[in-house]
UniProtKB/Swiss-Prot annotation:
Family from the record: Belongs to the actin-binding proteins ADF family.
Domain of life: Eukaryota
Main location, first listed in the record: cytoplasm
Motif (Nuclear localization signal): 19-23
GO annotations of cellular component type: actin cytoskeleton; cytoplasm; cytosol; nuclear matrix; nucleoplasm
Keywords: Actin-binding, Cell cycle, Cell division, Cytoplasm, Cytoskeleton, Nucleus, Phosphoprotein
Alphabetical list of Pfam families matching this protein: Cofilin_ADF
Signal peptide region: none
Residues covered by the ADF-H domain: 4-143
Database matches in SMART domains: ADF (SM00102)
Protein name stated in the entry: Cofilin/actin-depolymerizing factor homolog
CDD domains the record matches: ADF_cofilin_like (cd11286)
Effect of disrupting the coding gene: Late larval or pupal lethality with mutants showing defects in cytokinesis in both mitotic and meiotic cells, abnormal accumulation of F-actin in mature primary spermatocytes, and defective aster migration where the asters remain in close proximity to each other rather than separating from each other and migrating around the periphery of the nuclear envelope as in the wild type. Failure of terminal filament formation in the ovary at the third larval instar at 25 degrees Celsius but formation occurs at 18 degrees Celsius.
């Protein structure tokens, strides 16, 4: 079900700055006036994952957000002692259980529009609490797509 919410050009530009230019570590998006997905927060390249979790929850326990993060981790190929750095972009839909039903429905029905606008994201994650959004949970989901 489409919500009719559009994605602002600023979202697309900021995404390209993360994906191609490696200019930022992450961006938090929100739905403005129930009409358009827009940029709320942009973090510089040296920002940590903990800061991302703080920013995605910053508006309060009843608020939903989207977050795009350029995630880095070390990957070890099976049968070798060599490790290599991996980078994957993931897009998170943050809709806590404490959010009102109307807001959760708006964010979940608008997630598709954002996904279609941000081509090249490797993983989509839906989180309703911190256990689903933790660094460990996200890294596990990203590693599941690695080749052994």
């Amino acid at each position: 079900m489409a919500s009719g919410v559009t994605v602002s050009d600023v979202c697309k530009t900021t995404y390209e700055e993360i994906k191609k230019d490696k200019k930022h570590r992450y961006v938090i998006f929100y739905i403005r006036d129930e009409k358009q997905i827009d940029v709320e927060t942009v973090a510089d390249r040296n920002a940590e994952y903990d800061q991302f979790l703080e920013d995605i929850q910053k508006c309060g326990p009843g608020e939903c957000r989207y977050g795009l993060f350029d995630f880095e981790y070390m990957h070890q190929c099976q049968g070798t002692s060599e490790s290599s750095k991996k980078q994957k972009l993931f897009l998170m839909s943050w809709c806590p259980d404490t959010a009102k039903v109307k807001k959760k429905m708006l964010y979940s029905s608008s997630f598709d529009a954002l996904k279609k606008s941000l081509v090249g994201v490797q993983k989509y994650i839906q989180a309703t609490d911190l256990s689903e959004a933790s660094r460990e949970a996200v890294e596990e989901k990203l590693r599941a797509t690695d080749r052994q």
